[in-house]
Design a protein with these regions (language model features):
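Short, exposed beta-strand/loop patches in secreted or surface proteins that constitute
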Residues: 17-23, 49-51, 88-92
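Broad gene-expression machinery/nucleic-acid interaction feature
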Residues: 28-30, 44-46, 58, 85, ...
Length: 141
């Protein structure tokens, strides 16, 4: 996989959400963006995408602060049991707790496979089935 050509395609693809390069090496490319989807989420979401030249893709969606309570942990477990794509967890960042969703895929050796996966996951984030289990965690009911 040629990360340089992929980078240009990703930046063009990601213009609507302000996707920017965070870091690049010969083996990996990291991009990030702040996503605003007020129709679905009251606050912006931080998106980080990491692509390895081996064909592995990771997407991290970091939401706003949440409390690390038993109720939220049970809701996160429900989400994880129902979500075929994302895995949710509480990420401890700078002494604060945030809800984070993670998606990963391996064996994506063509640029188009990466672009299709990213597009699909961005759309999956706002699908009714995802929101059904995500909104209670975020108190967006």
């Amino acid at each position: 996989m040629n990360l340089l050509s992929l980078k240009e395609k990703l930046l063009d693809f990601g213009k609507p959400i302000g996707l920017q390069v965070d870091e690049e090496t010969s083996k990996a490319l990291t991009l990030h963006a702040g996503i605003v989807a007020k129709k679905y989420f009251p606050k912006s979401i931080y998106l980080r995408i990491v692509i390895f030249s081996s064909g592995t893709l990771h997407m991290f969606f970091t939401f706003y602060e949440i409390e690390s309570t038993y109720d939220n942990l049970f809701l996160i477990n429900d989400f994880n049991a129902e979500s075929p794509w994302f895995k949710a967890y509480i990420a401890h960042i700078n002494d604060k707790d945030f809800l984070e969703l993670h998606y990963s895929a391996m064996g994506l050796l063509e640029d188009q496979e990466i672009l299709t996966s990213i597009s699909y996951m961005l759309n999956s984030l706002i699908e009714e089935e995802t929101l059904k289990y995500l909104n209670p965690i975020l108190n967006n009911e």
